[in-house]
Amino acid sequence: MDKSGETHINAIISVIDHKILRAITGAHPKTPNEMLYLETGELDIPNVIRVRRLLYWQNIVSRHENELLRKIYEAMKESPLKGDWINMVKEDLNKIGMELKHEEQVKQMTRKEFKDIVKDKVKKLALEEFNNQKSNHKKVKDIEHKSLNEPQEYLTSNKIMQKTSCLLFNLRTKCQKEFKENFPKQNGGSMCPLCNENQDTQEHALACKVVAQKLGRNVTEVKYAYLFGDLEEQIKVCKVYRDILKLRTSLLAPRGTQDGPTGAIIPDPATSYV
């Protein structure tokens, strides 16, 4: 398969991969794709294939020189043609700071040793690529990601329910649909529907005077920065946002459709986030 064929297949598989990661994280359809990988610590499809191709390269160069597969490889290396597999290997190696001349060193390694080296280098490469992509998206460019070695703790901790982790993911990426400024082009107005005095942003929700009157001390005890803090801070701020969203639903519901007194927050186990 040549480069163009691989690119086409990668694009198809990547669409499926994105759908799976969006289902896991509860991500909004407009969430930048790189955030799916930066938050989960996963490699995208092109880099997964890069790792596997280099592992197969090690397998080939470790074979006896009289084996047919090794002979084909040597022929490609000596007289490469456009679209040959060897060209993709060269490109992969170049991206992680290696060359074909490192064959002898690679042959001396066990599969696990080489795999660990390749995965480490490819993860660093992917991290750089994702962070570069992230820098072009205003909503998420200031979120710091230093490694792809593991997912963000909130996605795997047993201290936090899946609904909470999905809420947190969308708050971190400014894709929680209830806040108008997250998607200004899709909303007729952008003012806070509760106080009608400030832009309807996630940050303002914690400072809204109506929210403060209704929820009181709970709101003042958390900071917006908690969304990007440790797990305990994230749990605290998510509880407040959960209550804010319930309050908004209660106060903004059409008259006669509320389940309790105006402004009351009705606990609902089926929709509880924490």
What are these regions (language model features)?
Residues 135-274:
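Family-specific functional microsites
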Residues 33, 48, 64, 90-92, ...:
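Residue-level recognition of conserved structural "scaffold" positions that shape functional pockets
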Residues 4-8, 106, 156, 180:
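Conserved aromatic-histidine-acidic binding/catalytic patches
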Residues 1-77:
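Non-catalytic, peripheral interaction segments enriched in hydrophobic/basic residues
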Residues 53-166, 238:
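Flexible, low-complexity interdomain linkers flanking nucleic-acid-processing modules
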Residues 23, 27, 43, 52, ...:
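Generic recognition of well-structured, leucine-rich alpha-helical segments
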Residues 28-35, 101-103, 222, 229-236:
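Short, surface-exposed acidic
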Residues 38-45, 111, 115, 189:
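Amphipathic alpha-helical surface "interface" segments used
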